[in-house]
């Protein structure tokens, strides 16, 4: 979870979850960092949408360290590993993802009006369609086994789009 310097429509936090291998990332803007939010997010965006993970690694923030999360992880038999407090390098994947997302959001917020919360879906889409150096593939292509079709390609059809 990452605090954002300037509030946007009352949102001050971004809850970020990343799948370790594919680098697929889901986010949700938060007004408050509460326990119930983390449990709902894990269930709705990871368990129900993809599958029950064998384990999750989280920081020690309120959205992940609470009874609601503990109960849902116990119910689905998911092991919960926590990164070392005050040692961000202990969860390098999360730190790298957060850094990249904040960079994308900051750039979009400078170029467009409406605050970062309205740009979060666009930033997430940009992150998902970009190849990662570790895998040489985009998270989108690893999850869906196809390349992203951008809105520009739909408006100006390319040979690739015409053959789909």
Locations of the language-model features?
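Integrase module of LTR retroelements
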Residues: 1-164
């Amino acid at each position: 979870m990452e605090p954002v310097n300037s509030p946007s429509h009352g949102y001050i936090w971004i809850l970020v979850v990343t799948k370790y291998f594919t680098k697929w990332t889901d986010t949700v803007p938060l007004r408050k960092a509460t326990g119930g939010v983390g449990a709902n997010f894990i269930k709705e965006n990871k368990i129900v949408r993809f599958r029950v993970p064998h384990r999750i690694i989280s920081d020690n923030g309120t959205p992940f360290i609470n009874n609601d999360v503990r109960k849902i992880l116990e119910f689905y038999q998911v092991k919960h590993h926590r990164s070392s407090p005050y040692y961000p390098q202990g969860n390098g994947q999360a730190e790298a993802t957060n850094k990249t997302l904040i960079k994308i959001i900051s750039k979009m917020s400078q170029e467009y009006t409406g605050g970062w919360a309205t740009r979060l879906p666009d930033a997430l889409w940009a992150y998902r369609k970009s190849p990662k150096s570790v895998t040489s593939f985009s998270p989108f292509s690893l999850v869906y086994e196809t390349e992203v079709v951008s809105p520009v390609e739909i408006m100006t059809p390319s040979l690739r789009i015409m053959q789909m």
